[in-house]
Regions:
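FAD-site-proximal beta/loop scaffold in flavoenzymes
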Residues: 114, 120-136, 217-260, 265, ...
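A Rossmann-like FAD-binding core segment of flavoenzymes
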Residues: 63-85, 89-91, 97, 160-236, ...
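Beta1-alpha1 glycine-rich phosphate/pyrophosphate-binding loop at the start
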Residues: 4-60, 65, 140-146, 150-174
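Glycine-rich nucleotide phosphate-binding loop and flanking beta-alpha elements
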Residues: 13, 110, 151, 207, ...
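Glycine/Thr-rich phosphate-binding loops of Rossmann-like dinucleotide-binding domains
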Residues: 37-38, 112-113, 153, 209, ...
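Short loop/helix-cap segments at secondary-structure boundaries that form the rim of catalytic
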Residues: 39-40, 114-119, 135-137, 173-180
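FAD-binding core/adjacent interface of flavoenzyme oxidoreductases
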Residues: 1-5, 73-139, 213-215, 237-241, ...
Length: 284
């Protein structure tokens, strides 16, 4: 059987690997970290963990599980995917892998702005997921950091729970509708004692905020998709219910396809993509 190469070893990629390798496929998973999940601390909305589970522990357990079943984990990044004589050529800085099928599961890359203090307050006011953490900021004042459609989308999620939300574009011109409340000043730093308390701007002024939701840029999978000629909608890869793209042998799962950016959904996507990629390989 031809090899299956999975790009991304977050929940979607590892879930796909578990199903494919158990079905007899040789599987290589390429990734540098656990994706967007690495920005989380305690996961409190995942089935079976009544007291929550640390994101780091969940990522590491999934990787060990896949390795124990025989999947190869390659810590690297994908430079490109090309069409080979039979199948695909997946290029990394160190090697080129031949694959009969490929699953793109790198998720949506989140660009972290270079703002002093942003790392200090991750988990203490700074969040990367509105739908995950909006609940904890009810009755408080929060900012969304970003200037595009992703920032506007996170704003709408937050406004369903929080009344006081402002988008801070960090000096960039917004591409979302001007009717959304926003501030275009360049951000100098985040400040606070034990948690985020204020945003200080480059002009010396400041504004109090209890939380900041980072929503800069968009997808990492998008560039791979466009180079391959995959159909996209916005910054998402278009798939059918089998997580198959418009190119036979290429599948996509997780945050890079439409739907909620949640662990449970990513695991489900991976299951579907892994089983369907296995069927595809067996048909070759």
């Amino acid at each position: 059987m031809e090899q299956l190469v999975i790009i991304g070893h977050g929940p979607a990629g590892i879930s796909a690997a578990l199903y494919a390798v158990r079905g007899g496929a040789p599987v290589t998973v390429i990734g540098k970290d656990g994706g967007a999940l690495t920005k989380a601390d305690l996961i409190q909305n995942y089935y079976g963990f009544e007291h929550g589970v640390k994101a780091k522990d969940l990522i590491e357990a999934g990787i060990r599980q896949a390795q124990n079943l025989g999947a190869r984990l390659l810590t690297s990044e994908v430079c490109g995917i090309e069409f080979g004589e039979a199948g695909f050529l997946v290029k990394t800085p160190a090697e080129v892998l031949r694959a009969g099928a490929v699953i793109i599961a790198v998720g949506t890359a989140r660009n972290v702005p270079k703002i002093e203090g942003i790392g200090q307050f991750e988990g203490s006011g700074v969040s990367y997921c509105a739908i995950c953490d909006a609940f904890f900021f009810r009755g408080k004042k929060v900012a969304v950091i970003g200037s595009g459609a992703y920032a506007a989308s996170e704003y709408e999620v937050l406004k369903g729970v929080i009344s006081d939300v402002t988008i801070l574009t960090d000096g960039a011109e917004p591409t979302f509708t001007a009717s959304l409340p926003h501030n275009k000043k360049k951000i100098a730093r985040f400040e606070g004692a034990n948690a985020l308390e204020r945003v200080v701007f480059a002009d010396g002024t400041s504004e109090a905020f209890d939380g900041a939701f980072i929503a800069c840029g968009s997808a990492g999978a998008f560039e791979l998709a466009k180079k391959l000629g995959l159909e996209t909608a916005g910054n998402k890869i278009v798939t059918d219910e089998k997580r198959a793209t418009n190119i036979p042998g290429i599948f996509a799962a997780g945050d890079c396809v439409a739907g909620l950016q949640q662990i449970a959904k990513a695991v489900y996507d991976g299951m579907i993509a892994g089983t369907e990629a296995l069927k595809y390989l067996k048909s070759l």
